[in-house]
């Protein structure tokens, strides 16, 4: 069967995705801050490079799939972490294993967002992430922002996720030309540790939106619902290319 790597597979959607892939007989490599097969800090350049290097050592014949799922919410209280992990960590790992995916004509799946509201992000941050890609410059720009202001954190979260969706679209044609599919998944609000940090106001707004799921009247989806989509997109069953 196949060999898949997942960032952030120690809990939440990543853990359910790992579980489902293992049930299907695949080998799964969990990359996480702790309790992973590869334990690194993907918010740091050193951690990202270490993860990529270890994957190249462990999978010399290639990867069937890379699922970039690790991320933090806007309520984490660390603005630099939001930028470095959500955007730069994801892009660096995906680019770092691109050659491994080419060897098997594999697939890359990127978790784009749990919560994106039109207009909630900062276009200047999105443009800097996509068009400049200078992590130090972005971190310097946000260093004077108020990390205790939840709206600031949420705005940066949305910005990183918009930038990821845009990045996926930009690279999709080149990757597809080399036999590698790349897709993005926007899960929405899911029962995870991330959504457990939602403010009372956010929870009230969520309760006012009767979004149907296969579980009926639940306001939040179960992680396994998203895991099924992730596994489908990472598998050979997915014949389309470059979807968000």
Task: Give the positions of each predicted feature.
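Short, flexible catalytic-loop segment of classical short-chain dehydrogenase/reductase
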Residues: 186-197, 201
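Rossmann-fold cofactor-recognition segment
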Residues: 33-47
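Conserved Rossmann-fold cofactor-binding substructure of NAD(P)-dependent oxidoreductases
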Residues: 43-60
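Catalytic loop of short-chain dehydrogenase/reductase
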Residues: 72-76, 106-177, 189-192
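N-terminal Rossmann NAD(P)H-binding glycine-rich loop of SDR-like oxidoreductase domains
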Residues: 10, 14-19
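C-terminal helical subdomain
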Residues: 92, 165, 184, 205-241
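Hydrophobic structural elements of the Rossmann-like NAD(P)H-binding subdomain
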Residues: 67, 110-112, 182-185, 195
């Amino acid at each position: 069967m196949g060999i898949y790597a997942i960032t952030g597979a120690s809990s939440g959607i990543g853990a359910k995705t790992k579980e489902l892939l293992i049930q299907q007989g695949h080998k799964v490599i969990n990359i996480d801050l702790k309790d992973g097969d590869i334990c690194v800090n993907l918010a740091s350049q050193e951690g990202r490079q270490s993860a990529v290097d270890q994957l190249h050592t462990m999978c010399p014949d290639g990867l069937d799939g890379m699922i970039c799922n690790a991320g933090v919410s806007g309520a984490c209280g660390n603005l630099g972490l939001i930028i470095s992990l959500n955007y730069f960590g994801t892009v660096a790992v995906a680019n770092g294993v691109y050659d491994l995916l080419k060897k098997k004509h594999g697939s890359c799946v990127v978790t784009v967002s749990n919560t994106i509201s039109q207009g909630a992000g900062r276009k200047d941050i999105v443009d800097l992430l996509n068009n400049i890609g200078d992590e130090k410059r972005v971190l310097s720009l946000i260093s004077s922002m108020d990390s205790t202001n939840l709206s600031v954190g949420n705005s940066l979260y949305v910005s990183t996720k918009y930038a990821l969706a845009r990045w996926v679209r930009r690279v999709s044609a080149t990757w597809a030309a080399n036999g590698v599919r790349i897709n993005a998944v926007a899960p929405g609000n899911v029962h995870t540790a991330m959504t457990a940090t939602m403010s009372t106001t956010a929870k009230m707004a969520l309760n006012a939106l009767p979004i149907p799921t296969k579980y009926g009247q639940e306001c939040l989806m179960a992680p396994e619902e998203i895991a099924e989509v992730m596994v489908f997109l990472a598998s050979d069953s997915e014949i389309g290319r470059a979807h968000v």
